[in-house]
């Protein structure tokens, strides 16, 4: 065992584990007080459901051997059977399993932000269980497994721009459209605790650094690069959103700045192990700009109730990051970009369109697979029960109605 690399992955695993409760705090601060606890429950219940799914068969589907198609693994590692020894970096294989579990958790948790305030908890649990199995595990295998279909074609996704963010953002949007908009008026959709959301977002940011740097698999130059460019991209994303609000609305907001922070982090996620510092400046800025205008179009023009903007931030941001990888990927940062069977450096580095075309192809696969399977899962569930709570429950608030608790009680 390599003690340094193993300790590094343990630290990164803890940081990524922090992301799920941090996201619950971030989300719950942005809803009305009557739905605070329900939002936390929706987000954190994935810890129980998806963690167990991952141990039983999720990891095996994601990283197990397949039958040659490169689409999904088999049951060889059912209940983590056969997980022993160390990988090439001297990290215990079981530690890699748990590190990757954290990615599966946060992917499912992101989806819940699109559905706050009206979806039944049981419906959500069933959906996330099947979505994680049929979408997340399949994409993880195709893009990250050594036998994966998209990996063999040359697609690059360092830390989950497609596997985690595009897939969850698209699923959230499909769910929001199928479940329907919240019945409450615009005033009743405002954030009840911006400081609470701020704390959650900052903890999410801290965890994200382990998410991106840890994807290197060991403590090396690529991990350090991922760590640094993630911070820079987040800063650019935050500032870009604030400036846009300042120019357009004359009032920069904290929630807007936090949205820009997340957009910058999402955008750099697939690229952080492949791009140089100057590229992170561009990626963070443009991801934030595209997410800003995408959010405005979806929320105010189309009037789709993607409640906490999962698609606008994670879906659009992930797409921006995937394309940016095809533009800026550099062998100077990561020699794997020009390794055997790789497609070479990004367009702005090499002048070749090969990697960019493959990145766009992989993005389309992520969008179509997640949209189609999410629609089918929700459609099947709707044949047996309503997807959303009754209107009187929604008006009263889901905290009291579904959980018998209140987030805040005055003495």
Where are these regions (language model features)?
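Glycine- and aromatic-enriched membrane alpha-helices
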Residues: 1-411
